[in-house]
């Protein structure tokens, strides 16, 4: 019963369902997920934690980044397999999901690293200042 309730609760939030659909065919880091959802990183992390607790997604660390992907259906409990199949079949043609896929493709096609301005040779303050000035144009 615990697994059922945990999975059911995880699916009661639109952003968590959007994350689940985004991770269906790819792995993404928190910064990429935050980028397409347009949420605060802490909010995104909370959603990811709930999805992991429900065993709907897995994570792995690569260097200093953590990447998330949908749970391997072959290894998942029946309740998770059923939930994933239901979500995929119900929402694969959903307009929000299709828009998310476009935003994700754009985010993933960028050459710069979303997660760290320092990786691009910028300091955070300078990067924020440039972006906020650019937004005023």
Identify the meaning behind each predicted range:
Residues 74-137:
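C-terminal regulatory/oligomerization modules of transcriptional regulators
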């Amino acid at each position: 019963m615990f697994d059922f309730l945990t999975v059911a609760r995880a699916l009661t939030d639109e952003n968590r369902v959007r994350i689940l659909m985004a991770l269906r065919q790819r792995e993404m880091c928190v910064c990429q997920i935050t980028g397409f959802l347009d949420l605060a990183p802490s909010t995104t992390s909370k959603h990811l934690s709930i999805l992991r607790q429900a065993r709907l997604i897995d994570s792995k660390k690569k260097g200093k980044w953590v990447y998330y992907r949908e749970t391997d259906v072959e290894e998942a409990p029946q309740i998770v397999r059923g939930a994933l199949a239901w979500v995929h079949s119900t929402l694969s043609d959903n307009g929000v999901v299709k828009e998310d896929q476009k935003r994700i493709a754009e985010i993933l096609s960028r050459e710069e690293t979303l997660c760290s301005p320092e990786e691009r040779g910028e300091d955070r303050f300078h990067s924020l200042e440039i972006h906020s000035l650019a937004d005023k144009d």
